[in-house]
């Protein structure tokens, strides 16, 4: 048994040549030999008390023959900074320069230093870094000392509290900063030079959110400072390194020239990562099986915080439209997994970072909070954090804490939801005063192995609210009087779908915008799964065609646009909805309406060439346009002018400094009707003109373009190994292929053949998912 108290690390960097020398002291005790994780590092020597200790090296570990030992292990090693990958320690270019940065979750600290790279092996870290004098250095803790040594300097940081290896951070380069203070805590936004002007919004959000969490959790933020760092090349949205949170630039930077969507995204991601400072950093899961504990809770809490602090954004609407919706779709596939999933290998761990660990888990937490009540739920959270701070915990520890806080049998209720995969569809039929209920597991492919869940139903019958725990496959409720109206799963707090035998009783109910969203989303998925025909789905869509709520309109247009992309000659209801809703939302000034207007405009510009030609003229004044319409104008310009517009859009893309602006123009560059222009745009990724981080994000968008799918497929097949090298060590490319395969394969049998005959072990699950979705779409094409 090994116990580690502290890592004392000294790193000497050659910034220009992207190499470093490391000297590490590990304070530990062990009953036997020490096994450290180490990948890609050159181990020069291992000593104790100045004497060499024998060791052996495998591909991923060092076996150090200490025998029983209590003391300090001294390791000298050498490392390299990656130039292509986006995990471990890597180079992040910007303009004509770069920074060195790190990304260690889940198992990449071992590529930086020899360590026990396991979340349960918490330790203190004391870090010193030798760099060129003109470079800045950021880590988890404040700087304790700076000492000059020739043309270099040694920067020493304060010691961290006990924490897991994956939360360690180091950034080297040139940074600009803005600061604020909350009590004794420094809150700092850092960017590469020339970007800090867009940091103030995130700084303000962070201060409000930390204050909110300190109150909600009943525990102060534990470190002296909190850095929020915009990284110019970053694989994920953000990473919760304790005291030094990293973000891709589009997840942190926003100002008055940003769209509503951009500001909402920044607020959401900042709140998510700050929630981790308590839930993940202060208290950490024992092993990756319980990753959902970190991610579900941060997802849930970020929406809770923003819903409270920015009420005008209706963030629970955003929650169901993104988190719940994505999780319901992912969990309807046969390739899904339980929230609590057993994993051992790095590949398995990476595949857990998905809609189940984030969205489903967060949706279950929302369901449990609704069942327990706000205060009892909060009390349980506080018990959990106070019991396990600076330590590790399991899912059982979490549910037990909620039981202590509420006095209710939480573990018993949630067991089905976290240990079983999938979820039910509840069939609701009415006979006089009687409600007949039946449940079965919902599959996108139509059918499969059944399961029975404990479903905490919420109903409103004849205007009266009822709660009922459905524990059997079939059950019934008699309310004692004839039923005139009914709705089930009020405000979409439950993680299940509802099928009604008589929809007129639903439309007799008073439906909130969340209820309408749920009904519409359910029946769209019933159509995809072959449970209802298009006529039934279309009749519901027509009920909502003139609805004036942003969430309902977003969902309506999103579903109809999805069908248009499957077969634009068959599914044309979109053309009836868009003119009416674009006109209506163009007159509204509130932020949610402006966001919806932006989406409507972009969709209309892509699907309708006549509308696009009218909008394209606005490109002349692109720089002065409302940020909410810029993307639509770029798309319209590409659709209208084709090849003649390409160079102008490309030059505009190249001249923009901020990623938010570049992304808008990139969507324009992928909207051409001419396939070779879309391929030319994708090929910018090969030269670095499109950031490595963005390739996976734009591939699905490109695949939605029905005019260029065959050409895009040839490009993807040709450059598959390049893409794999960019995202090595992550599951990002796999998730991208899950979205891309269904559209590229609609009319191209080669796609299925390619992915069934070629093996990609790190993406196997998501490729199977994509093929399953493709089967579903082929039924409706």
UniProtKB/Swiss-Prot annotation:
Q: Assign the protein's first listed, main location to one coarse class.
A: cytoplasm
Keywords for this entry? Aminopeptidase, Cytoplasm, Hydrolase, Metal-binding, Metalloprotease, Protease, Zinc
Q: What class of enzyme is it?
A: hydrolase
Q: Where does substrate bind?
A: 105, 237-241
Question: How is its cofactor bound, per UniProt?
Answer: Binds 1 zinc ion per subunit.
What InterPro entries does the record point to? Aminopeptidase_N-like_N, Aminopeptidase_N-like_N_sf, ERAP1-like_C_dom, M1_APN-typ, Peptidase_M1, Peptidase_M1_aminopeptidases, Peptidase_M1_dom, Peptidase_M4/M1_CTD_sf
- What are the subcellular locations of this protein? Cytoplasm
- Pfam families membership: ERAP1_C, Peptidase_M1, Peptidase_M1_N
Entry's SUPFAM superfamilies?
Leukotriene A4 hydrolase N-terminal domain, Metalloproteases ('zincins'), catalytic domain
UniProt-listed CDD domains:
M1_APN-Q_like
Site label Transition state stabilizer, positions: 358
Asked if Hydrolase is a keyword of the record, the answer is yes
Q: What is its EC number?
A: 3.4.11.-
Active site: which residues? 273 (proton acceptor)
Q: Which Gene3D superfamilies match?
A: 1.25.50.20, 2.60.40.1910, Neutral Protease Domain 2, tricorn interacting facor f3 domain
| UniProt-annotated binding residues for Zn(2+) | 272, 276, 295
Q: Which PANTHER family match?
A: PROTEASE M1 ZINC METALLOPROTEASE (PTHR11533), PUROMYCIN-SENSITIVE AMINOPEPTIDASE-RELATED (PTHR11533:SF174)
Q: Which family does it belong to?
A: Belongs to the peptidase M1 family.
Q: What is this protein called?
A: Probable aminopeptidase 2
Q: Which organism is it from?
A: Sulfurisphaera tokodaii (strain DSM 16993 / JCM 10545 / NBRC 100140 / 7) (Sulfolobus tokodaii)
């Amino acid at each position: 048994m090994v116990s580690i108290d502290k890592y004392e690390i000294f790193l000497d960097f050659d910034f220009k040549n992207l190499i470093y020398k490391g000297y590490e002291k590990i304070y530990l005790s062990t009953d036997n030999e020490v096994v450290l994780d180490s990948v890609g590092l050159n181990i020069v020597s291992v000593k104790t008390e100045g004497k060499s200790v024998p060791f052996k090296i495998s591909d991923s570990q060092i076996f150090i023959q200490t025998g029983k030992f209590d003391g300090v292990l001294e390791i000298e090693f050498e490392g390299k900074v990656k130039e292509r990958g986006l995990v471990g320690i890597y180079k992040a270019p910007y303009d004509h320069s770069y920074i060195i940065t790190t990304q260690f979750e889940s198992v990449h600290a071992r590529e930086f230093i020899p360590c026990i790279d396991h979340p349960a092996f918490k330790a203190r870290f004391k870090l010193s870094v030798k760099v060129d004098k003109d470079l800045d250095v950021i880590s988890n803790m404040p700087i304790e000392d700076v000492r000059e040594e020739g043309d270099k300097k040694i920067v020493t940081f304060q010691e961290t509290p006990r924490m897991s290896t994956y939360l360690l951070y180091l950034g080297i380069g040139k940074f600009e900063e803005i600061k604020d203070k909350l009590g004794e805590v420094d809150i700092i936004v850092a960017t590469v030079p020339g970007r800090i002007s867009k940091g103030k919004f995130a700084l303000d959000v962070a201060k409000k959110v930390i204050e909110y969490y300190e109150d909600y959790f009943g525990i102060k933020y534990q470190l002296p400072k909190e850095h929020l760092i915009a990284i110019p090349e970053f694989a994920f949205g953000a990473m919760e390194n304790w005291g030094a949170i990293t973000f891709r630039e589009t997840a942190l930077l926003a100002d008055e020239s940003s769209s509503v969507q951009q500001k909402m995204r920044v607020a959401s991601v900042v709140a998510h990562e700050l929630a981790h400072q308590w839930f993940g950093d202060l208290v950490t899961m024992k092993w990756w099986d319980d990753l959902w504990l970190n991610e579900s809770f941060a997802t849930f809490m970020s929406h809770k915080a923003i819903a409270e602090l920015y009420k005008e954004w209706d963030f629970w609407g955003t929650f169901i439209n993104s988190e719940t919706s994505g999780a319901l779709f992912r969990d309807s596939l046969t390739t899904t997994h339980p929230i609590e999933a057993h994993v051992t290998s790095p590949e398995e761990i990476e595949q857990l970072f998905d809609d189940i660990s984030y969205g489903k888990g967060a949706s279950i937490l929302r369901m449990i909070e609704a069942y327990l009540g706000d205060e009892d739920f909060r009390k349980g959270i506080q018990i959990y954090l106070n019991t396990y701070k600076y330590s590790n915990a399991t899912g059982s520890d979490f549910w037990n804490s909620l039981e202590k806080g509420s006095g209710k049998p939480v573990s018993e209720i949630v067991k089905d939801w976290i240990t079983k995969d999938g979820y039910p569809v509840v069939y609701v039929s009415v006979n006089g005063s009687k409600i007949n209920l039946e449940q079965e597991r919902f599959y996108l492919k139509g059918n499969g192995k059944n399961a029975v869940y404990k479903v905490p139903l919420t109903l409103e019958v004849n205007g009266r609210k009822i709660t009922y725990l459905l524990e059997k496959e079939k059950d019934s409720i008699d309310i004692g009087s004839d039923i005139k109206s009914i709705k089930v799963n009020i405000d979409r707090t439950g993680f299940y779908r509802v099928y009604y035998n008589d929809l007129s009783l639903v439309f007799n109910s008073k439906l909130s915008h969340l209820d309408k969203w749920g009904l519409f989303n359910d029946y769209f998925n019933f159509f995809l799964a072959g449970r209802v025909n298009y006529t039934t789905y279309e009749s519901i869509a027509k009920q909502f065609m003139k609805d004036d709520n942003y969430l309902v309109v977003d969902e309506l247009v999103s579903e109809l646009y999805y069908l248009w992309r499957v077969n634009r000659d068959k599914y044309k209801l979109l053309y009836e909805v868009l003119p009416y809703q674009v006109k209506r939302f163009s007159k509204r000034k509130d932020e949610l309406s402006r966001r919806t207007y932006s989406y409507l405009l972009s969709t209309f510009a892509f699907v309708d060439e006549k509308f696009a030609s009218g909008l394209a003229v606005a490109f002349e004044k692109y720089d002065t346009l409302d940020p909410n319409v810029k993307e639509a104008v770029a798309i319209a310009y590409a659709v209208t002018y084709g090849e003649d517009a390409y160079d102008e859009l490309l030059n505009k893309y190249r001249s923009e400094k901020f990623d938010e602006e570049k992304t808008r123009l990139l969507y324009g560059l992928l909207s051409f009707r001419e396939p070779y222009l879309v391929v030319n745009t994708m090929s910018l990724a090969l030269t670095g003109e499109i950031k490595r981080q963005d390739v996976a994000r734009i591939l699905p968008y490109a695949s939605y373009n029905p005019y260029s799918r065959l050409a895009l497929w040839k490009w993807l097949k040709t450059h598959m190994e390049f893409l794999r090298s960019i995202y090595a060590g992550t599951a990002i490319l796999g998730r991208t292929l899950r979205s891309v395969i269904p559209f590229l394969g609609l009319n191209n049998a080669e796609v299925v053949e390619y992915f069934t005959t070629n093996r990609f072990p790190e993406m196997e699950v998501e490729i199977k998912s994509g093929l399953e979705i493709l089967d579903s779409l082929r039924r409706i094409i």
